[in-house]
Design a protein with these regions (language model features):
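Cleft-lining beta-strand/loop regions that shape enzyme active-site pockets
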Residues: 2-3, 36-38, 47-48, 52, ...
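N-terminal positive-inside, membrane-proximal cytosolic segments immediately preceding the first
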Residues: 1-10
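Conserved functional hotspot residues or short segments at active or partner-binding sites
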Residues: 365-366, 370-584
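Sec-exported extracytoplasmic/periplasmic mature domains
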Residues: 60-69, 81-93, 108, 122-123, ...
């Protein structure tokens, strides 16, 4: 959760940062060190702060005068600041000017680039999809283009982040991208003028079934998020929406005011949404209520969360769960209940600094424990039983094993029991009991399909390379799968680009010719043929209709979404139960 703060203004941290960065940019550390010493002896400062500054001054001078090699002062400065912040919590972080500018761009939901989604595969970074109407779309970049150079620099060994940083830049300035395209005899060059690229936080909104709307708020919480949700709900109601699935999975959070506004669109006016407590001038508890919307519609609502649902999205899920407004389905959320402010440093660098903690309407702390100091434990191992596994490339795709709850026999939905409650219990007005201190626990737990197994990770990889050739008309006998133009905004019929037995056999042959490269055999594909079909279907639909259509293909077989749809009658019963308790 991030809020804005234009200037830094907090105690000795600011003083040390300003003095150290000033010393380095001044270029004369010993003279600057004497100035620091004068400041550190200022009797108006507390003794503890004077001691800290004195020790810092001594260490700085000793390094400057005695280190055996040249000193990278900028690197030393950045490491010093980050080291200090890392002792506080996992979310207080230092940013260089370039990274800080990028962070602020992300929260303004706009950046200057070309409009492509990219991903690092085994041998290079490739274009996964192109955003309709952007400079990249107009220039002719396509799904599957292999990025070879950016502005004359060899990019074949770059990470996706390196390519992204190089492609982004000043609005109106060109960037030259050299690509290799399946079926092309020679590399192609594109000079593309950078422009603003919209980054909507509502990534999908459509009627998934008659009367049932699906809205994916998965792109964070930026300055326009509340407006996007309001528009999506209005559009869905015009199309006959009577019940809703709100998808908050993989939403990393963002701006606190936007989280409050989004939650307010589902709650009666005056309802509390979140309380915030700080240590200094914010030490008093601030309770934020719905003051803008009459969001008391009583249509059934199911909210999807997973382990990557964090911060602002947990505020929304927690408020809806506390008030009984929505049924939560999925996995226990990330557990980030700390509020950061953005602080700008004198030379354009910046900080995100934790200044407050937030709590659900009934007082639950969402923040997970981070006292071990291990960032691996905090970000990867959500509980001690977790084992490390390869990162899943995309969302789960196939129905999983039976769910842990069968709501057909539970007319009054209850939260999933937590075996080891991390915080104190709270009881809502409707008599439901929840525990704080460990994220938002779903009412119905549904595990995603394990797509991170070694075999499935390889199927994902080879499916992309196969479809890259398929969409270019390079697979013998399947030339009719060639994609000449992307039909954005359309959803394919089941008969469009079907993954038939013939396609699957071509896939096996593609693997058979290059087993050494992909590390998978046709027999392994046969053992997981349904997953292979789904991966190919996702890729070819993405190539032909864009990433939104590809995502819908995956959602059609998403076990968590399928359970959410199945649970809508239980969401209706929950709403009726809460209304009855409020009336009594």
């Amino acid at each position: 959760m991030i809020e804005r703060q234009k200037q830094i203004g907090f105690g000795w941290i600011a003083l040390v940062i300003v003095l150290f960065t000033g010393a380095i940019t001044g270029g004369v550390m010993t003279r600057r060190a004497r100035h620091i010493a004068d400041v550190s002896q200022d009797s108006s400062l507390p003794a503890a702060e004077r001691q800290i500054e004195s020790d810092y001054d001594e260490a700085l001078s000793t390094v400057d005068e005695n280190y055996a090699d040249d000193i990278d002062y900028e690197k030393a400065s950045q490491a010093s600041i980050q080291g200090m912040l890392s002792t506080l919590d996992p979310h207080s972080t230092f940013f260089t000017k370039a990274d800080f500018d990028r962070l602020k761009q992300d929260h303004e939901a706009e950046f200057y680039g070309v409009g492509v989604s990219i991903l690092r595969h085994t041998d290079a970074v490739y274009v996964q999809s192109v955003v309709a109407g952007t400079p990249a779309d107009k220039a002719g970049l396509r799904y599957g283009d292999k990025i070879v150079e950016v502005d004359g620099k060899d990019a074949r060994e770059w990470t996706g982040d390196q390519v992204s940083k190089s492609v982004r830049g000043v609005r109106g300035e060109p960037v030259t991208i050299k690509i290799e395209r399946a079926g092309a005899q020679a590399p192609l060059y594109f000079q593309i003028v950078r422009d603003s690229v919209p980054q909507p936080t509502v990534r999908a909104a459509y009627m998934i079934r008659p009367g049932t709307a699906y809205v994916a708020l998965t792109g964070g919480f930026a300055s326009e998020t509340s407006d996007e949700i309001e528009k999506a709900l209005t559009d869905m109601q015009k199309q006959g929406m009577t019940q809703l699935v709100l998808d908050l999975r993989n939403n990393p959070g963002g701006l606190l005011p936007q989280a409050i506004k989004v939650a307010g669109q589902f709650l009666p006016r005056g309802y509390p949404i979140v309380s915030v407590r700080g240590r200094t001038e914010n030490a008093q508890t601030l309770v934020y209520k719905n003051t803008e919307f009459d969001g008391a519609q009583d249509f059934p609502l199911v909210v999807l969360v997973n382990r990557n649902t964090a911060s602002a999205s947990e505020i929304v899920a927690g408020a809806l769960q506390d008030h009984g407004r929505g049924l939560i389905v999925g996995e226990t959320s990330f557990g980030k209940g700390l509020v950061q402010h953005l602080f700008t440093l004198p030379y354009g660098d910046g900080l995100t600094l934790t200044t407050q903690k937030y709590f659900t309407p009934y007082g639950r702390s969402i923040q997970r424990d981070y006292s071990s100091g291990s960032l691996y434990d905090y970000y990867v191992r959500h509980d001690p039983t977790d084992e490390p596994a390869p990162a899943a490339p995309r969302s789960p795709t196939l129905p999983s094993s039976p769910n842990t709850h069968d709501l057909a026999s539970q007319p009054t939905p209850q939260p999933t029991p937590s075996p080891k409650p991390a915080g104190p219990a709270v009881r809502t007005a409707a008599g439901r009991v929840f525990y704080g201190g460990g994220g938002i626990t779903p009412d119905i737990e549904v595990k995603p399909l394990d797509v991170a197994t070694p075999v499935r990770a390889r199927i994902f990889e080879v499916a992309f390379h196969f479809t890259r050739q398929l969409a270019a008309g390079q697979i013998a006998g399947l030339e009719n799968y060639r994609v000449d133009k992307v039909l954005y905004g359309q959803h394919p019929r089941a008969t469009d680009y079907p993954v038939t037995d013939r396609v699957l056999e071509a896939f096996r042959e593609f693997v058979r010719k290059d087993v050494g490269t992909f590390g998978i055999t046709p027999a392994q594909i046969d053992a997981d043929a349904d997953y292979a079909r789904l991966r190919i279907r996702d890729e070819i639909v993405t190539a032909a209709y864009g990433v939104e259509a590809g995502s819908r293909t995956l959602l059609d077989a998403d076990p968590q979404l399928l359970k959410a749809l199945e649970s809508l009658p239980d969401a209706r019963r929950l709403a009726e139960m809460v209304r009855a308790s409020s009336a009594s």
